[in-house]
């Protein structure tokens, strides 16, 4: 049976530096949305579009800004940024199991691998020759840590994560199930129509505080390492090809594809399904909207999009039909421009006579 986590509202307020408006001894046993919260839940209002749910919410207390709290009759924790406060408090209610330190008897650890005594190695995990596992690292069941790979302190690997050889991971990195780090990059040379394989002799280097989602793949470099900066956040099912460089604190949503040798700056955001061609550069502070295909370098910060927005199917079909007519329309427009120029030129000549 799952035990109940419980904190007083005052304890939660102290954790995030909030001002309590109401009963500081109120017990809180979980977090929930405004629509779903009950009397034992703490909720939050961060997005104005959900303000309409605040008056009728059954939440025991709500994280609010001072402005929103002034008109609220219920119990509140007043903070400058409710969403950040919610993020901090979420860890208090996280029920993710914490593995005990030690190596499971079914795990296979090479004689010359180094595993910190405070680390946890799960059932049937494999740690190959020369690998180094830092303090407090948790390695889930059936993970494979390749030769000479390094995992920094506080790392967490869900079950069935694969690190190939020579992968260097910084501190406090979380990797979800199915991720493959350090697979061979897609490198081939064409000889008279036949593809000859290029050995991928680089590695992968990942900074501190990185999160990597389920079934995401990061290929090793052809010569130098593929580089993932500090604080990068990668969603599920992302493909990062060989030699890619991603700057600090950049975030990518699911199904992004980054082609080889692309460079992405710091503090960028790539929405779901974005694709980048290879050998281009994206500067810092760029936001790319969902399903955009980036085919050239971006040198100025800002928001970028491509493709067509959603519209009713019948209208979309008409738009698609017009796209097929663009070449003919352009040709006809050029003809009209030439005729107009001729008429204008003729008129000017007549007025001069």
Curated annotation (Swiss-Prot):
Catalytic activity: a UDP-3-O-[(3R)-3-hydroxyacyl]-alpha-D-glucosamine + a (3R)-hydroxyacyl-[ACP] = a UDP-2-N,3-O-bis[(3R)-3-hydroxyacyl]-alpha-D-glucosamine + holo-[ACP] + H(+)
Leader sequence residues: none
EC identifiers of the protein: 2.3.1.191
Pathway noted in the entry: Bacterial outer membrane biogenesis; LPS lipid A biosynthesis
One cellular component (GO) term of this entry: membrane
The keyword S-adenosyl-L-methionine appears for this protein: no
Active site residues according to the UniProt entry: 242 (proton acceptor)
A biological-process GO annotation: lipid A biosynthetic process
A Pfam family per the record: Hexapep
Keyword Lipid biosynthesis: yes
HAMAP family: LpxD (MF_00523)
Family: Belongs to the transferase hexapeptide repeat family. LpxD subfamily.
Protein name, UniProt field: UDP-3-O-acylglucosamine N-acyltransferase
